[in-house]
A protein has these predicted regions:
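Extended catalytic cores of very large enzyme megasubunits
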Residues: 1-474
Length: 474
């Protein structure tokens, strides 16, 4: 193709020449040639048969490929490329090396991309294995000795690569996931067998069928059809073991609880997660603090604390943290909140959003004067009135200047919230990107399906979306 000398007969003759050389030099089933061996013979065959232009292009191609291989080995700090590294392009490997591959205390990469995807696939499959019909009883009411299982958590190093699922070994952190997963179902009375019996079954290779499940998950990832979230890539099969990307925390109007939330946020950032918080419970700036007879600094000041913590703690040593800061539209400090990010350098680790309820829309659309009441966070009493049209204009202007704030339609979200009664109140916060509404101390586990890889070519040469493959992946 590079020399515009495409010819099927020529290609066949060259192939026969290469095969003849391989055979004459003793290569075969018992002594397979390397890629370099084959490429050397292709090169010499082209020259011997007088195809100098094709040989020149092939030599240049090999040179470029060698440069890419050398750069890949440099990025991965290795002398040999594993199968995934050969297939992934250089930019993909740079991302894996900078974010996801395990490193030692000297910051040296200690695993290959193949090992990364295997450790992730193994941990995901452990969850499936624990729901095997020989282990899991969905109706519950089966008591087990949970303390016996918990004992294994004190001696994890004794079980590093001791068990395997088919051909895939469990490291000590996979084993920890197995123990914790078992404890979770046992506490609900859903474990049919003891943990010791589970290990007996595992040692007897009764769960080898799940090796195919591991391979399936592995192939989805290495074929770049599906990828889990970053914390899963960073932590699955590792010491931290934290797989969730997004959390929501509460922010009560109490100094001790504020500091507890700050501490929890720091731990989440450390493990690679992000946080959404509704700051509306915090009293407005200037309100009296009874315990000190002082005045409150307001919600925005506490957002600055979380912002600083985010700045200082790089997520899992890999990336900056992310926050969603929310304030209800009825909060007395709402104007300051809306305009806070119009200046550069303010709350750079935050997305901010105004939480809007039905009474605001009524004031904006239905009332003649647009009067809207801002209320005390302590007792709900009126603090002052503001024009709803002024607020919506302020939101629009600030969003035009700085792309902040967004709007969260809590009236619509809670219209379809089936958990309000069970959780004792409405949803009032979302994860950092805003796509998942959550209650405090809930998390969401995200993943991505690569739709571009789900197209197929039809008999007439056109392309269409492969709905069947999409359904299988989901």
């Amino acid at each position: 193709l590079a020399t515009s000398e495409g010819d099927r007969d020529l290609a066949q003759n060259l192939t026969n020449g290469v095969l003849g050389k391989l055979s004459s030099q003793g290569f075969g089933t018992e002594n397979p040639p390397s890629v370099e061996d084959i490429q050397d013979m292709v090169e010499s065959t082209l020259i011997e048969q007088g195809h100098s232009e094709i040989a020149k292009s092939y030599i240049l191609y090999r040179h470029e490929r060698r440069k890419i291989r050398d750069e890949k080995m440099k990025v991965l700090n290795t002398k040999v490329l594993d199968p995934v590294s050969k297939e992934f392009d250089l930019n993909c490997l740079r991302v894996l090396a900078s974010r996801y591959l395990f490193r030692n205390n000297k910051n040296e990469i200690t695993e290959s991309p193949t090992q990364l995807f295997e450790r992730v696939a193994v941990l995901i499959t452990i969850g499936d294995l624990l729901h095997d019909s020989s282990i899991f009883n969905p109706t519950g009411n089966t008591p087990q000795n949970i303390e016996e299982a918990q004992e294994y958590l004190t001696k994890l190093d004794q079980f590093n690569y001791k068990f395997k699922i088919d051909e895939y070994y469990l490291n000590q952190y996979h084993f920890r996931g197995l123990v914790n997963g078992y404890i979770d179902i046992a506490q609900k009375g859903q474990a049919k067998i003891s943990f010791k019996d589970l290990l007996t079954k595992l040692a007897a290779k009764e769960f080898t069928d799940y090796g195919a499940r591991i391979t399936e998950y592995y192939n989805l990832m290495v074929n770049q059809v599906f990828l889990p979230n970053s914390p899963t890539m960073m932590n699955a099969g590792g010491r931290l073991g934290q797989l969730s990307a997004c959390f929501v925390l509460g922010m009560p109007d109490d100094m001790g609880k504020i500091m507890k939330t700050t501490s929890d946020a720091a731990l989440i950032f450390k493990s690679g997660g992000g946080v959404g918080i509704n700051y509306s419970e915090l009293r407005e700036e200037g309100d009296i603090v009874a315990s000190t007879s002082g005045v409150a600094s307001g919600p925005v000041s506490f957002m600055n604390i979380i912002n600083t913590v985010t700045d200082v703690i790089k997520q899992g040593g890999k990336r900056r943290g992310a926050n969603m800061g929310i304030m209800d539209v009825s909060h007395p400090d709402i104007e300051k909140f809306i305009t806070n990010k119009t200046e550069p350098g303010v709350l750079e680790n935050f997305n901010v959003s105004v939480g809007v309820w039905g009474d605001f829309w009524s004031a904006l659309v239905d009332s003649e004067d647009g009067a809207y009441t801002l209320r005390s966070t302590r007792d709900g009493s009126p603090v002052r009135e503001i024009n709803a049209h002024h607020l919506i204009d302020l939101i629009a202007t600030s969003a035009w200047k700085s792309a902040e704030p967004g709007l969260i339609f809590f009236d619509i979200i809670n219209k379809y919230n089936v958990f309000a009664k069970a959780r004792g109140g409405p949803l009032r916060a979302t994860n950092p990107c805003g796509e998942q509404s959550l209650y405090p101390y809930e998390s969401c586990n995200l993943g991505s399906i690569n739709l571009a890889n789900l197209t197929k070519r039809t008999a007439d040469g056109q392309y269409e979306f492969d709905w069947q493959k999409y359904e299988e992946i989901v």
